[in-house]
């Protein structure tokens, strides 16, 4: 698989218009691994439409807490959970990320508990790790180095 950047959405702001672009979200593909940058509305559908699988999803990076960058983070986490990736997904974002995810999971607790009981899924909190960052290098592996700065 070729290294590439896939643009899921390029529109600023959360308002949608017929025939318009989706809000901000991209996927950086390196050696077959997918790193999602921002989770604007539509990211989950665009991820699947691009032909990716949840097993390819390595990390999610949220650049800042505007709705056009994080509105569908919960949905992406949730669908990756029911898609049963073979590994933990790393999620990085600025201060407030853990609260955002915790509140989403709490809002879906009824459905999550039913799926754990009926479908035998593991706890959703076990499918990801969450790291809040400030500035500097926030992630580095053998394929990618990510540095955050205040703008």
What are these regions (language model features)?
Residues 1-151:
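Binuclear metal-dependent hydrolase catalytic cores
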